[in-house]
Amino acid sequence: QYTANVADECSDWNDYSKWERHGITNTHFYDVMYMPDLNLYVRLHLGGVDIDTNKSLSELGDSRVLYLMLFDHEFNIVGEYKLKEKTYNYFTGWCTLSNGLLIFKDNALSELTDYDGSQFDIYRVH
């Protein structure tokens, strides 16, 4: 397992700079999605990063690692995979298929991003 399946609680909700720091340094979990042909659930999540004062919050955010986690019908973890770094859009640029996941390839830090067309990877689960 690459990351903990929980995120730390933010210590100060009244200070926006602490909230931003918390958002970058902690794991972020996305919605759980269902793949009906496999009777499995899939969830993407971002790993946290250390704050580097030489980089913008945007650059730090786009450099986070994206993970794919699979769950069985009782939500037991059956797999976790580290996806290609600096490749995918972290703002809901994906959708489930009946037997996999489609993820758009448009990370701002990628030199291969084609903004004139759509590029994506399909991760099929067997």
What is each stretch, according to the model?
Residues 98-126:
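Blade-level signature of beta-propeller repeat domains, shared across WD40, Kelch, NHL, RCC1
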